[in-house]
Amino acid sequence: MSSMIHSTTIALLSGGLDSATAAALAVEAGQKVIGLSFDYGQRHRKELQAADALAAHMGLSEHHVISVNLGSWGGSSLTDLTQTVPSEGVVDGVIPNTYVPGRNTVFIAIGLSLAEARNANQLVLGINAMDYSGYPDCRPDYLRAYQSLADLANKAGREGHGIKLWAPLIDWNKKQIVQEALRLGVPIDKTWSCYSGGDHACGICDSCRIRDAALSEAGRSDLCSKSTP
């Protein structure tokens, strides 16, 4: 979780506001940033289209989209169309059905592989405080444990210059992330946060509601709820 600056950074780019802001911080720091996105069997293509647009906007040197079909075995409303995406909000202490089993563990592992292949020293993640209340693989202790594993599991770590997992937004709420995105010039209109598919954001899923509240506080009018016909 180090914020140490290195010459090359791999950015896990989902297409959402959080990962876009994290990637933009690496770009601002003067890094050569390589984007990495995943087609993991999610409900829709909108977030991958957003990731591609964001990578182009930020001028990333490379943008890889890797197919890892976590939807093959379901286990989440984001990959299993027979499950309903909840609209009632997150219940404290309950992991929502939007949690995708093992998703971040798999994504970070592939990110570390790309980082080694490109001699990158850093992996930047958009994980933040709004995530780890519900998702076990978004918590600070998870990242610390993964960092220890990464230092043991790859050549760079064994040689004493391990690849750092950088989560610059880890203690931030969504309002702070929106404010930082605006400062960095992140094209918020190009990001996609909605859990559901369709031409327009649903405006009612938990992701849309959290995003809308933060955008509204920041004085923005481009709300998910207003994009719904």
Swiss-Prot record:
The gene is queC. The keyword Nucleotide-binding applies. This is 7-cyano-7-deazaguanine synthase. ATP binds at L13, S14, G15, G16, L17, D18, S19, A20, T21, A22, A23. Belongs to the QueC family. GO terms for molecular function: ATP binding; ligase activity, forming carbon-nitrogen bonds; zinc ion binding. Keywords: ATP-binding, Ligase, Metal-binding, Nucleotide-binding, Queuosine biosynthesis, Zinc. It comes from Prochlorococcus marinus (strain MIT 9313). Zn(2+) binds at C194, C202, C205, C208. Its cofactor is Zn(2+).
